[in-house]
Amino acid sequence: MSSFLDYSVMSGEGSSCSVRAFHSDHGITTFQSCAVSVNNCGTDDRFMASRASPDGIPHQSYQAAVSSLGLAYGAHSACSSSYAPQSFCTTYNHYPLNQEVEPAAGFPQCGPLMYSGNISSSVVSQHRQGYGTTPLGQLQYTHSAYGAGHEQPSPFTGCSNPLSPLHAAHLEACCSPLSESASSAQTFDWMKVKRNPPKTGRSGEYGYGGQPNTVRTNFTTKQLTELEKEFHFNKYLTRARRVEIAAALQLNETQVKIWFQNRRMKQKKREKEGLLPTKPTSSDSGERNQEKVEDGESEKSVSAPSTPSPTSSTVSSGADSYPSN
């Protein structure tokens, strides 16, 4: 990735070396020599390569800042032993070079860089980190020194909420009924319906009155009178006669049919209990008539006087007519 790095190196003896490092991945690279004014270091040693920005952006020099990118370099072989590997911290800026960069793109922390002579483009590694709100060209990178033992808070506060407003509203809508039901049970109108206990069948005069949900037909006095009159003449009705009675009494066929069934059962039960006299059948009447005839004939034979028969009278008269000689 095209980038521009500008480092400011602080040495221990007051001597300074201004170092500018650029990636050499794209385009033509222009190298500039960096003279190091240290005791035993020669001027021909080049520590880092620089690359000029094609857009003509002026190079900016940054002061050393603590809690920034930590870099460590080893001492050159020509330098004296007093210049041991030292670490320095600095900040850097990013400039796009001949390549489009995504808006608000961030980069992760850079690792410590070790170098002893020349720096190649593969030393500095940069990776994408996330999305921010800083405009292009003014991206500032905050880095924590390695080995510091603490984490630096993330500068991206816009991504702290992992749920979008739509998902958050949906989550609240789903969780709110559960919390309400857990706290207090809600009573609905359909739960307040009064449920009457089922009515038990009451034993009447002629047994149970049927199921409690059966609608009982209340007959008027006129209807009962006409039904009793018809029952007196006909215990069983034909369908045509049932239709006529139902139409005359403003009833339906089923009501008339059921009334006659119940009336027949009541009649049989009363006859069994002896409350009503039993009507004579044809066989009984025949036997009774035969008995009456026999009784009448016996009475006539007993009451009639005894008269002599004509034969006996002729015999007696003939005997009297013949005299004895």
Swiss-Prot record:
CDD domains membership: homeodomain (cd00086)
PROSITE patterns in UniProt: HOMEOBOX_1, HOMEOBOX_2
Molecular function terms from GO: DNA-binding transcription factor activity, RNA polymerase II-specific; RNA polymerase II cis-regulatory region sequence-specific DNA binding
Record's GO cellular component terms: nucleus
Principal cellular location given in the protein's record: nucleus
Composition bias, Basic and acidic residues: 285-300
DNA-binding residues: 212-271
InterPro entries the record matches: HD, HD_metazoa, Homeobox_CS, Homeodomain-like_sf, HXA1/B1/D1
Motif stretch (Antp-type hexapeptide): 187-192
Function of the protein: Sequence-specific transcription factor which is part of a developmental regulatory system that provides cells with specific positional identities on the anterior-posterior axis.
Protein keywords: Developmental protein, DNA-binding, Homeobox, Nucleus, Transcription, Transcription regulation
Taxonomy, superkingdom: Eukaryota
Compositionally biased residues, Low complexity: 301-317
Localisation per UniProt entry: Nucleus
Region of interest: Disordered: 194-215, 264-325
Name of this chain's protein: Homeobox protein Hox-A1a
Family: Belongs to the Antp homeobox family. Labial subfamily.
